[in-house]
Amino acid sequence: MALELAAASLLGAGFTQADRLLDLSTPLGQDRLLAERLQGTEQLSDGGFVLHVDALSDDAHIPLKAVIGQPVQVKLQTALGRDEHRVWCGLVSQARFEGANGGFARYRLRVEPWLALLRQRRDSYAFQDLSVIEIIDSVFGDYNGQGAVAPQWRWEVKDRDTYAKRSLTIQYRETDYAFIERLLAEEGLFYWVEHEAGDGEPGTHTVVIADHNGAFEAGPQASVKFQRADATETEDTIQAWRQSRTWRTNAVRLATWDYRAMQARKASAQVDDKLPNAMELADSDYPGQYLFEDGDQGDRLAHNALAAQRLRQSLYEGEGTVRTLAPAQRFTLTGHWGPSQGAGADFVVLRIRHDARNNFDESLGRAVAQALG
C-alpha cells in the first residue's frame, strides 16, 4: 500500500524535475523520465565521457528504440546557484529496462558523445597527401547527415602548418574510432568534449582537439579549497588529495627510412631532469617508412612521445564535491597543509568521476528503494 501511495504522491506532484539536483531531458518529452542517479567518467581523449543515468518513470512500457541513438541532456545543479548547472549533452548508446514495481519503472541510459558511433564502423582506406587535420576532418565529416547525428568539432592548435601532408596514411581493418585515436596519439594531439545546454530540449556537444597547454582554461570555480566535509560549507571543496610519482622512460629515439632520399632519418628527445641516480631508459622505435621528412618533424614527434611518457611521472588525485570541474579545466588548489602536495599551484583536470543522486524526499526515496532496490 505504501508503494502505491508513494507513486501517487510522485504523480500528484506532476512528476516534475523542477528545482531538483539532477534534470534529464529526452526526446520523449519533459518529465517522462525522472533522473534518479548519475554515474559517469570524463577524461582527456579516450572517448571523452561515458554517463550512466538511472531514471524513473510511471510508464513501464516505454519502447527502448524510442531513445536509442537520440540526443539527451543531463543537468546537475551546482553550489554556484539554483540556476547554475553543470551540463552534459550526448547520444544514448544503450538503453535498458531495469524493472517495475509499485507504480515505478526504472530505466538505465548510457550517454556518450557522437564519437562513440565511430566504434561501430570498421573500414580499410588509403589517405594520400593529406595532413592529419585534413584526414580527421574527412572521417568526421562523413558522419554528417546520418540519422540524428550532427557531429561538431573544433581545432585548437597553435599552428596548422606544423602538420605537414602525409604521403600515405593507411586505415587497415580498423574502426574509425581506433584509427582516429591512433592518428591523434602519433601527432601529440588530445581532445575533450564541451557541452552547450539547450532551452527545454537536449543541447549540443563539441569535440575540441588541441596540441598545447594554452588551450586549457579556468572553469567556473577557478580556485578550489582543500577542506574537510562540512554541512555548513556553502562552497564545493576538495576533501582528499594524494600525489603519486612513477619512474618513467626518460628518452625517446625514432628512426625511419626516407625512400625518396634513399637514406635513414633519426630523431630523439631526452629529459634534462632525471631522477637522482637514474639510468637512461630509452624507448626506441622504428614506426615505418617515411614517418617524417626532415629533422624538425622528427624532433617534434620524438618530443611528443616523450611528453606522453612524462605526463604520468607525477600525478595528483582528489575527492570532493566540486561539481563544476571538467576535463581540460585549470584550477588552483588553496588551503592544503602541505606545499609539496601542490598547495597554491595550478592543476589541469585529466580525468574525473561523478556520482550523484537526486534530491528526493525521504518517503519517496524509501519507497523507490523498497520497490526497485
What are these regions (language model features)?
Residues 1-373:
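Amphipathic alpha-helical and helix-coil boundary elements used as assembly
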